[in-house]
Amino acid sequence: MLHIAPPQAAPDFVRNSVLAHQEGPSKGWLNVDIHTLQHKNYPNIFGLGDVAALPTAKTGAAIRKQAPVVARNIAAILAKKAFDDKQYEGYSSCPLVTGYGEMVLAEFKYDNVVD
């Protein structure tokens, strides 16, 4: 069985803007801190999911862990408070079909750490 993911790219309006990395392996992806998901140059911008330059798989499982971090960080900015220590740890997962009615759920975090 073969599992192939299509090529991924951020939307044109991000890739072709000053918000994206302009060179290197993250070229075209939104330039965010990998833990806070806050843009590195524009603190009022956050990115998650298929647009962010994160060294992880762009999956629904990743978004599920990224969204609460972004929500808390935006709430902190609105309340004029510092970010708490809740950060995105790079979680992502990918279901791999191994046979009829069978699969393996591969889970990852930054540095290959899994709870």
Task: List the predicted regions and their residue ranges.
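C-terminal, flexible cofactor-proximal segment of oxidoreductases
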Residues: 74-115
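Broad hydrophobic/π-residue packing in well-ordered secondary structure
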Residues: 4-5, 43-46, 69, 86-89, ...
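Short, electropositive alpha-helical surface patch
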Residues: 59-69, 101-108
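FAD-site-proximal beta/loop scaffold in flavoenzymes
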Residues: 1-65, 75-76
